[in-house]
Every structure is written in C-alpha cells, then in structure tokens.
Swiss-Prot record:
Family: Belongs to the leguminous lectin family.
Species the sequence originates in: Phaseolus vulgaris (Kidney bean)
Maturation propeptide residues: 240-246
Pfam families with a match to the protein in the record: Lectin_legB
Biotech utility: Sold as a diet aid under the name of 'Phaseolamin' or 'Phase 2'.
PTM comment, free text: Proteolytic processing yields active form.
Name of the protein in question: Alpha-amylase inhibitor 1
Keyword terms: Alpha-amylase inhibitor, Glycoprotein, Lectin, Signal
Quaternary state and interactors: Heterodimer of chain 1 and chain 2.
PANTHER family reported for this sequence: CONCANAVALIN A-LIKE LECTIN FAMILY PROTEIN, LECTIN
Lineage of origin: Eukaryota, Viridiplantae, Streptophyta, Embryophyta, Tracheophyta
Region forming the signal peptide: 1-23
Role: Lectin and alpha-amylase inhibitor. Acts as a defensive protein against insects.
CDD domains: lectin_legume_LecRK_Arcelin_ConA
Length: 246
C-alpha cells in the first residue's frame, strides 16, 4: 500500500513538472492584408487602403517600425530551449535614384522591453551598402552582396528560418518576375542572444536626402514558431520516466 502511494505521488509530481515544462507558447499567423489591429505602428508606419504595410512616406527622412500586435516567445527559460521559426513576407522597395539611396528595410526581433535581457536580432536588406546581412546586437554575423535594382519596384519574396536543432539561421530573397535570388545562412546560438519574449516585425528608413529617398512596403506576412526540441525530447523522456514509475 505504501509502495503504491509512493508511485502515485511520484507520478503526480512528474505530471506536474511535465505540465510546467510544456508551458512554452508557440505562435502562428498569416496576414494577407494588414490592419491597425494586427500591428503596432511606430513612426511614419501606416496601413494603406488596400491593406499594405507602408513603412515610409514618399519623401525623404521618413523612419518607422511595425510589429506584430502580440509578443512572441522565442526562448523558454525553464528549459533553455529556443523555438524554431519560419517567416515569409512579400516586400516592395522602390528607389528614386539609380545610385545607392536610403538604408533599406529590416526584419527584426527585439526585446519586448528596452531594459529586458537579450539582444536585437536583425536581417538587413541594406540598400546603401548593397548587402543582405544577419546581425546580432548591431554586429554583422554574416552578409552577402545584393543589388536592390534587381528588385526595384517589384514584389520580392523573402523567407527567413531558424532551426533550433542545427542552429542554422537562413535568409532567402527572390524575385519571381526575373528569377533573381540571393541567399545567406550562418550559425547563431539564439539561446545565448535572446530572452524569452520578443517583438517581431519590420523597420525602415527612406533616406536623409530629398534626391535619394525610397519607399518600403510589406504586402503580406506569415510567421510560425515551434519548440521542436522541447516536444520531441519531452515525449521521449516522459515515456522512459513513466515506465520507470509504473
């Protein structure tokens, strides 16, 4: 009787711990048309009448940021696990000068609060330095050259992925109209760079000079995160532990 009670107590404690460990929040959304309820708009960012996210005005010295309306969990401090994520968006950058003009458009993961622990992770589509780069806390980790004029005024498809198992951070940019593409990938240990919750979105600046401004639109956006390691490892461990308990 005492042995049976001990087993039941062990099982109850294990299930309680497992329930706590499963508390990581996964996120998935698809936005085909933006509105002010699914975004947090800052600076000059606005939503057009046809549902496009406009990150800069049709003029110089315009700066803005736009984030998904809810924070997203990227790391689980209880386990130390980091989510894998996959995000896709369609963007349109239009320059108004043949030479390098403004700064470009960034995809960003930033701490929910400025004083929060964790760095900013950025994918830069830099039109001034003509490069696509993966940055952590303003440090260029990996970059490749690109020519914005291969995409100028045309809808470009972007895919950004992070695999928490391999720690590979990948970026691909393509122009369906011309077949042009650019790709960059590198290893990033996100568990050392980010804290649990981040704001995910975009930032852009149109340029400091009237003769060299550019506009930046995002037409659609999808995002999904999953604690792959967390679930797979727990499922395997739970079966082993339950067998031992029972």
């Amino acid at each position: 009787m005492i042995m049976a009670s001990s087993k039941l107590l062990s099982l109850a404690l294990f299930l309680a711990l497992l329930s706590h460990a499963n508390s990581a929040t996964e996120t998935s959304f698809i936005i085909d048309a933006f509105n002010k309820t699914n975004l947090i708009l800052q600076g000059d960012a606005t939503v057009s009448s046809n549902g496009n996210l406009q990150l800069s005005y049709n003029s110089y010295d315009s700066m803005s940021r736009a984030f998904y309306s809810a924070p997203i969990q990227i790391r689980d401090s209880t386990t130390g696990n980091v989510a894998s994520f996959d995000t896709n968006f369609t963007m349109n950058i239009r320059t108004h000068r043949q030479a390098n003009s403004a700064v470009g458009l960034d995809f960003v993961l930033v701490p929910v609060q400025p004083e929060s622990k964790g760095d900013t992770v950025t994918v830069e589509f830099d039109t001034f330095l003509s490069r696509i780069s993966i940055d952590v806390n303003n440090n260029d980790i990996k970059s490749v050259p690109w020519d914005v004029h291969d995409y100028d005024g045309q809808n470009a498809e972007v895919r950004i992925t992070y695999n928490s198992s391999t720690k590979v951070f990948s970026v691909s940019l393509s122009n369906p109209s011309t077949g042009k593409s650019n790709n960059v990938s590198t290893t990033v240990e996100l568990e050392k760079e980010v804290y649990d919750w981040v704001s995910v979105g975009f930032s852009a600046t149109s340029g400091a000079y009237q003769w060299s401004y550019e506009t930046h639109d995002v037409l659609s956006w999808s995002f999904s995160s999953k604690f792959i390691n967390l679930k797979d490892q727990k499922s395997e461990r739970s079966n082993i532990v339950l067998n031992k308990i029972l």
